[in-house]
Swiss-Prot record:
Biological source species: Phytophthora capsici
Keyword Repeat part of the UniProt annotation: no
Pfam families: Crinkler
Recorded phenotype for the gene knockout or disruption: Leads to the loss of abilities to suppress pathogen-associated molecular patterns (PAMPS)-triggered immunity (PTI) in host cells.
Chain residue ranges for the region called DWL domain: 59-107
Protein known as: Crinkler effector protein 4
Length: 426
């Protein structure tokens, strides 16, 4: 699920351009509601009465001037623009697709507000009003309690709060002398004074790649630098009112992303993430921890995280077993690059079909790697997601066929039962 930033403009209203954010997996009917909520004073009709069109002509997005110059045809539709289907997802290929990237100065959605829309005191409008009010009450009482954590803004206090919310315990594991003797020594990365971490990202990517090149080639993997703004580690944690957002510095995954970078959000064949800090602080571990949690929920593979300054701190983290009904994230720290790269090579040499438990040269016991989605509770069909889907389904049907009184009442009852303060009266 990716947040899209869409620039919208109301047709025939000069200076009406505005920006909205919406999940790419949301339906267009949801986009209508978001647009109305963004403009409560200027858009007074029901959200379902809005008509949305792609602000695109000749396969090119319109700019502000182009959107302002759009004319309506005899049907009240912007000439040459494709109407968006309220029953389809925003990311449907007929709309924005999976690889949509907004550009500066572009307008993406044209909004047509019907003329002569007047409120009515009829039974129909009353029922729509009730459903809309109850929907907003539910969102305010239940859905608005979600907490959002941005990886790069993680602090010790936020990290401790996140771990507490997810009921996760972090357990350090002490390293042992390497089996088979000391690994081949490797020089520490040399940081250039006066340059930021970001300015040296290309250099340290080459450093990592040079020390694990053989295993990368043998397993068709690569070390990929994640550009700023590519928030590929953004996810809603199932079963918890927690959202994680952001990215990491480097990811080791299938080499196909070098040929086709647009596959990066899918994280094909991902093995591990690498968070680089020139100076490792107490909050750095929580940043790597939140990135690991996000990636674990996004992909099917068992993955590892590495927090490192590329000199004397190489901390590996992974989702381990469960103890006292709490998921364990284990961590072990090495102090030399030679040891760390030997561990990385061992990890990457494991096939994608290998057992989740593996032997690493720095640990006495096999590393147990598990998935958080097997250890954390999920939201039931009758709770948050089910309620939200019921409300959206009602609006989808009503936008096409008109209000359904029985369905509206059923949705209202379902919502009120889910709110503790109202469940007594339902």
């Amino acid at each position: 699920m990716v947040k899209l930033s869409l620039q919208c403009a109301v047709v025939d209203q000069a200076g009406s351009s505005f920006d909205v954010e919406i999940d790419d997996s949301a339906k267009v009917s949801k986009l209508k509601k978001v647009i109305k909520e963004e403009n409560p004073a200027t858009i007074t009709c029901d959200a379902k009465d809005l008509q949305l069109f792609l602000a695109k002509k000749d396969d090119a997005w319109l700019d502000g001037a182009g959107a302002a110059a759009v004319e309506l045809d005899e049907h009240g539709h912007p000439q040459g623009c494709v109407q968006m289907d309220p029953t389809l997802w925003v990311k449907n290929p007929k709309h924005f697709g999976d690889n949509f990237q907004p550009g500066e100065g572009q307008v993406h959605v044209l909004v047509v507000v019907p003329e002569g829309v007047v409120g009515s005191a009829s039974e129909t409008s009353k029922m729509d009003f009730v459903v809309d009010k109850v929907s907003k009450l539910y969102e305010h009482s239940v859905l608005s309690k979600r907490t959002r954590y941005v990886h790069s803004e993680m602090s010790s206090s936020k990290g401790n709060k996140l771990v507490k919310e997810l009921k996760i315990r972090v357990t350090p594991v002490d390293a042992v002398p390497f089996t088979g003797g000391s690994p081949t020594p490797v020089e520490e990365f040399e940081w250039i004074k006066g340059r930021t971490e970001e300015q040296q990202s290309g250099r340290y990517r080459d450093y990592v790649e040079a020390n694990i090149g053989d295993v990368l080639r043998n397993n068709k993997l690569c070390v990929f630098s994640v550009e700023k703004g590519a928030n590929i580690l953004s996810v809603e944690v199932p079963g918890c009112d927690v959202d994680l957002a952001g990215r990491t510095d480097m990811i080791v995954l299938s080499a196909i992303v070098q040929k086709f970078p647009h596959y990066l959000p899918h994280l094909p064949g991902v093995k591990m993430l690498i968070e680089v800090k020139r100076e490792v602080k107490s909050a750095s571990e929580f940043q790597a921890l939140s990135e690991l949690i996000a990636m674990d929920f996004i992909v099917d593979e068992s993955v590892m995280a590495l927090l490192t300054n590329l000199t004397n701190h190489w901390e590996f983290l992974w989702v381990s077993n469960k103890s006292n009904n709490r998921p364990i994230i284990a961590t072990t720290t090495l102090t030399t690059p030679g040891e760390a790269f030997e561990v990385i090579r061992t990890l990457l040499a494991q096939s994608s079909t290998a057992d989740a438990d593996i032997m690493l040269p720095c640990l006495a016991e096999p590393v147990k790697r598990r998935k958080l989605n097997q250890m954390l509770p999920f939201i039931g069909e009758a709770s948050g997601d089910g309620i939200r889907e019921s409300i959206e389904r009602y609006y989808d049907i009503a936008s096409c066929l008109g209000p359904d009184f029985d369905m509206a009442r059923a949705v209202a009852r379902q919502v009120t039962r889910s709110i503790p303060t109202l469940s007594y009266f339902s």
